[in-house]
Amino acid sequence: MAVGLLSAGIIGVSSCDYLDQKPENLKTTDMIWETRVEAEAYLYNIYGYIWLSTDDPVVFGFADETSCVFSNTNVRNMVEGNWGPSNTLGDNKWSAAYRGIQKALVFEQNIDRVPEGVLSTDLKTQYKAESRFLRGWFYWNLLRLYGPFVIFEKPAEQDEDFNNYVRRPFDECVEYVCGLMESTLNVLPDVWTSTAYLGRPTRGAALAVISQARLL
């Protein structure tokens, strides 16, 4: 009886040790900033929060130029009065924009941790400018879609009380967008010479956002 219990205990301990093992390929946050590939992948992920202008192909139905016959579009939600906090224009672009902003802030806060021999100072400067442009772009679209927004200067913590954050005055929001864009003008090129950078922001794109924001 004693031998049987001892054997069962040994088997149980062995099973626990086997199940408690950590996957060898499990990535940590620190590992992101150890290699160029991982750091660049993090930046590219921020670009993924940019939504397409064709997200809702029947936007004409928002006005009176035409009627929308599709039943599963955002247009129907508006004209039928079915919009709510969790069911908004464009599949809640408010949430998508702030996710992109938070990731951009994390990127800018940590990109300098990548070793110099892995990622040059010039590339770090370029990537930070791209990230600031993306933040400005997200904020600019928040302003256009929803009006004044909440400004984050650093990544938010998960346990923060977000009720303490308030929307800033409209003029302050415009200046904030313009400030982010202006901070990229001496870094972003007029034209990217390599096809590897197609789709990246340019100096002209930043100036275009500034001019549109000033006209609001």
Task: Indicate residue ranges for each PLM-predicted region.
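Conserved, well-structured interaction surfaces
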Residues: 35, 40-52, 73-146, 162-175, ...
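Membrane-proximal, proline-rich intrinsically disordered regions
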Residues: 15-61
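Sec-dependent bacterial lipoprotein signal peptides
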Residues: 1-14
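Short edge-strand/loop segments of extracellular domains
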Residues: 155-159
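Aromatic-lined, polymer-binding surfaces characteristic
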Residues: 141-142, 148, 152-154, 197-208
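Short, solvent-exposed turn/loop segments enriched in Gly/Ser/Thr/Pro and often Arg
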Residues: 57-72, 150, 198-200
